[in-house]
Design a protein with these regions (language model features):
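Residue-level signal for threonine
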Residues: 21
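Charged interaction scaffolds used for protein-protein
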Residues: 1-12, 30, 36-50, 67, ...
Length: 127
């Protein structure tokens, strides 16, 4: 996958790429009302269990984007999607806390804009 767009986490001894795609952005928008509301929702989770559920949902969503891309490109060798139950069973609450930085990095990479400057314009002549 493209390292400029993804970050890697280890879940249960297996590496998973987290990637923010347009599809993931739409799902986040449905759940939180937009990317801007995501941080507020995570910080204002009413209880510890709810906060864990939100992080697990996000990890599953972002990790499955890379799997879905793989499956699209390799129809002859599809990989199984990660489930929220898988993430719950293969992680500890401490792992989930550590994954927050990776989630943030994946979100940043997914929304990063590369601005390229052009050379001097042909129309900038000295008069």
């Amino acid at each position: 996958m493209d390292n400029d767009r993804s970050t890697v986490i280890n879940i249960g001894g297996m590496d998973f790429e987290l990637i923010l795609t347009t599809r993931a952005t739409k799902e986040i928008g449905k759940r939180y009302g937009g990317l801007g509301n995501l941080g507020d929702k995570l910080m204002k989770a009413e209880n510890f269990e709810m906060a864990l559920d939100e992080i697990i949902w996000l990890i599953t969503l972002l990790a499955n984007q890379a799997i879905l891309i793989h499956n699209l490109r390799h129809k002859d060798a599809p990989k199984a999607l990660l489930t929220e139950d898988d993430v719950e069973l293969l992680t500890t609450p401490l792992d989930l806390t550590a994954y927050k930085a990776s989630i943030t990095e994946a979100m940043f990479k997914g929304t990063k804009r590369n601005v390229e400057s052009e050379g001097p314009s042909k129309n900038t002549g000295t008069a």
